[in-house]
């Protein structure tokens, strides 16, 4: 059965997967299987007398049901705030129905892809509901993509229409021009302009109006939305395995891959993330995580499940973070380590004490002791998460235990640095030898590859069957991350497989070296990669961004500091000062740094 399920699931990763999914897939409604991936009912349903599967006891899971419920239960409660723009949950529901209707009226049919290029503005929030409500697949795109990469992703996703924010119209047109040149037979993509709101305080009005007047577009967002019908009948998924979104990986290694999410996975991960974030009803969530990144860690849907309020931000800045926390009584937020760094390094005189405690989720790298201490001092409670685009964002959580509160800061930091245990949406999380698939000892020392299994693992890579097969070898999803496991079941990431530095036959964890570098008082950010060496094979090369006021520091001082805190073979032999390239989600683009280190050659 496992082989049959896998074989059938792979059928969707055809260049025309939308059509295959709907017509020939055994998961489609024509098989009458609903949420079951086989054509027949489960064995127990056939052998136990009196059981019957019907609409009375089964319907495909989908996060769009959260909005339907909130429109009734939380009808008049505020769903979204953007400047002085406020919507209730009923208004959001009505707007999403109209937008879904308008998309259908444009001739975009079930299974087609709708692309979106926008920051955390109301339209981006509404598209997460309206697109699947029309039976379509949302493809949120990284707002920091260049026209060349954007054109590749638009072609690969086979998007039929592109929603684009007014500030990104120039980039979108550049991508469409490249797309037209590369494929003469391709029909022109319809372009929907998300216009500037009068209440968009973070927007540059002059440049925005210039872009809108200089570049053409087919429809304007609000005008298109108003053309729709608020009585539109939602096009529910025929099967909960139907795709709800395609999320492209952040491009930290090479060209992004399209990760397919299902309605089922999005539903389960939304609830799991709500649980691990300890969200009770009526949370107030500040959007510092990009909605285009793993659908905002699935909290675009999760906040709706709890009838919460979304505080949208076009741009993330410490000033806007503190302002909105105080103004809207924010309870939860999230962000990469760069966001935490931004907060604690904000001009001290401008810090306003938080009026209440704020829960903040972070992932990407463990919080450093000095960052954690400062965040707690300011009134934030930091939770450490870990996951990948392929696991719908957060897949693990460093679940905090009350008995740890009395420990020293150093001990608490060590515990909080661990990536923790799987959340409730996953069946399994393990650290295994990727060659033997044996679980490594839980001694906190033996390294293996982190592997996931469960309902919140991606359906696969869009139109890349070989990559999907490789990722699922041995019936586990291979993360590519190296970790150790502790006796209590918590895991701790040590490095990416490809980032391990082998010097003189010794394995060096780049993460360990980065932690020491970042503990230096002058260092704001650091990333470590391998530099070729004729004698040792490779040596650590540190790329360092200094804090303001430390411009006179020398590389030798940083190297000496590392030698004082690490075995000498692990200390960087090279230090390069400057900005560190990152994706828009805050992940370091180490492939660019490796290229620089390779160009340096041997010491």
Swiss-Prot record:
Q: Which NCBIfam families match?
A: PRK08162.1 (NF006020)
Lineage, please?
Eukaryota, Viridiplantae, Streptophyta, Embryophyta, Tracheophyta
Q: Which GO terms describe its molecular function?
A: ligase activity
> What is the recorded name of this protein?
Isovalerate--CoA ligase AAE2
Q: Which reaction does it catalyse?
A: 3-methylbutanoate + ATP + CoA = 3-methylbutanoyl-CoA + AMP + diphosphate; hexanoate + ATP + CoA = hexanoyl-CoA + AMP + diphosphate; butanoate + ATP + CoA = butanoyl-CoA + AMP + diphosphate; pentanoate + ATP + CoA = pentanoyl-CoA + AMP + diphosphate
Look up and give the organism this protein is from: Arabidopsis thaliana
Classification via CDD domains: ttLC_FACS_AEE21_like
Keywords of the record, alphabetical order, are: Fatty acid metabolism, Ligase, Lipid metabolism
User: What is the E.C. number?
Assistant: 6.2.1.-
Instruction: Answer whether the UniProt record assigns the keyword Hydrolase to this protein.
Output: no
Q: In which tissues is it expressed?
A: Expressed at low levels in leaves, flowers and developing seeds.
Q: What is any one GO biological process for this UniProt entry?
A: fatty acid metabolic process
Q: Which PANTHER family match?
A: ACYL-ACTIVATING ENZYME (PTHR43859), ISOVALERATE--COA LIGASE AAE2 (PTHR43859:SF5)
The free-text function statement in the UniProt record for this protein reads:
Catalyzes the ligation of CoA on isovalerate to produce 3-methylbutanoyl-CoA. Can also use butanoate, pentanoate, hexanoate, 3-methylpentanoate and 4-methylpentanoate as substrates with a lower efficiency.
Q: Which SUPFAM superfamilies match?
A: Acetyl-CoA synthetase-like
* Gene from which the chain derives: AAE2
Q: Which family does it belong to?
A: Belongs to the ATP-dependent AMP-binding enzyme family.
């Amino acid at each position: 059965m496992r082989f049959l399920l896998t074989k059938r699931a792979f059928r969707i990763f055809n260049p025309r997967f939308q059509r295959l999914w709907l017509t020939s897939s055994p998961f489609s409604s024509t098989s009458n299987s609903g949420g079951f991936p086989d054509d027949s009912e489960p064995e127990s349903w056939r052998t136990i007398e009196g059981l019957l599967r019907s609409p009375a006891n089964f319907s495909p899971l989908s996060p769009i049901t959260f909005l339907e419920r909130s429109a009734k239960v939380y009808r008049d409660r505020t769903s979204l705030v953007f400047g002085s723009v406020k919507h209730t949950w009923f208004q959001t529901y009505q707007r999403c129905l109209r937008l879904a209707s308008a998309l259908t009226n444009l001739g975009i049919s079930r299974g087609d892809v709708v692309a979106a290029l926008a920051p955390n503005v109301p339209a981006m929030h509404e598209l997460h509901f309206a697109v699947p409500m029309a039976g379509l697949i949302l493809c949120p795109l990284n707002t920091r993509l260049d026209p060349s990469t954007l054109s590749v992703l638009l072609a690969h996703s086979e998007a039929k229409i592109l929603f684009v924010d007014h500030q990104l119209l120039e980039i979108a047109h550049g991508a469409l021009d490249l797309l037209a040149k590369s494929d003469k037979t391709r029909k022109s993509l319809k372009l929907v302009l998300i216009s500037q709101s009068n209440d968009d305080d973070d927007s540059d009005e002059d440049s925005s109006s210039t872009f809108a007047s200089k570049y053409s577009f087919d429809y304007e967002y609000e005008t298109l939305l108003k053309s729709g019908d608020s009585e539109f009948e939602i096009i529910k998924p025929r099967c909960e395995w139907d795709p709800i979104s395609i999320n492209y990986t952040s491009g930290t290694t090479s060209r992004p891959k399209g990760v397919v999410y299902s309605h089922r996975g999005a539903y389960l991960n939304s609830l799991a993330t709500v649980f691990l974030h300890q969200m009770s009803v009526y949370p107030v969530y500040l959007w510092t995580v990009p909605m285009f990144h793993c659908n905002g860690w699935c909290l675009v849907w999760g906040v709706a499940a709890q009838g919460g309020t979304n505080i949208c931000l076009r741009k993330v800045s410490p000033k806007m973070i503190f302002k909105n926390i105080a103004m809207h009584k924010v309870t939860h937020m999230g962000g990469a380590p760069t966001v935490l760094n931004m907060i604690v390094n904000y001009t001290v005189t401008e810090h306003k004490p938080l009026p209440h405690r704020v829960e903040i989720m972070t992932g990407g790298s463990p919080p450093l002791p000095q960052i954690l201490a400062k965040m707690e001092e300011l009134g934030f409670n930091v939770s450490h998460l870990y996951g990948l685009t392929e696991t719908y964002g957060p897949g693990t959580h460093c679940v905090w235990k009350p008995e740890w509160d009395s420990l020293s800061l150093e001990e608490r930091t060590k515990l909080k640095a661990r990536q923790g245990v799987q959340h409730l949406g996953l069946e399994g999380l393990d650290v295994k030898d990727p060659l033997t698939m044996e679980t490594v000892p839980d001694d906190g020392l033996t390294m293996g590859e982190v592997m996931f299994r469960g309902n919140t693992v991606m359906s696969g890579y869009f139109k890349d069957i070989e990559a999907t097969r490789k990722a699922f070898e041995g019936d586990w999803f291979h993360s590519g991350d190296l970790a150790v496991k502790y006796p209590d079941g918590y895991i701790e990431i040590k490095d990416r497989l490809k980032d391990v530095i082998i010097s003189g036959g010794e394995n060096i964890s780049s993460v360990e070296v980065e932690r020491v570098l970042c503990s230096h008082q002058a260092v704001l950010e650091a990333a470590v990669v391998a530099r070729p060496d004729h004698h040792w094979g490779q040596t650590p090369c540190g790329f360092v961004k200094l804090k303001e006021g430390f411009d006179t520091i020398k590389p030798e001082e940083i190297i000496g500091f590392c030698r004082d805190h690490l075995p000498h073979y692990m200390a960087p032999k090279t230090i390069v000062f400057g900005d560190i390239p990152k994706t828009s989600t805050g992940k370091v683009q180490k492939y660019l740094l490796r290229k620089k280190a390779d160009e340096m050659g041997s010491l």
